[in-house]
Amino acid sequence: MLRSKLPAGFVVPAQPVQRAAPPSGADWVHEIKHDAYRIIVRRDGERVRLFSRKAIDWTARLPAIAEGAGRLKAKSFTLDGEAVVVGPNGLTDFEALRRRGSGDVAVLYAFDLLEYDDSDLRRMPLETRKTTLASLLS
């Protein structure tokens, strides 16, 4: 998608890069990769929109996530995360996410806070963003 065609407020998420071996050392953070859809959640005032990593509006497809984001106590933010359906065994279930039947509710596993109350946080250290994210979600 051309940048000029991106929706207002959309932030292009960072993409993982495959390596032969994971990095090691105290400066690295490792995240679990779930069977999920990558989602950018953008709230601006009362309006909440969910986007796929390719900037497709998924708000209507994931209403529980949009409703939950609307209840957070912030006037604006952009979250990066993964929409998942957790099965009865506690594991993410990608097929349930794809079909989302009447009993399958998608939830967001948020792992980064890119913008918060009109401030771009992407240049801040990841640890700081994660601390702010935890505060927003609590």
Segments and roles (model prediction):
Residues 1-138:
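Catalytic cores of nucleic-acid ligases and guanylyltransferases
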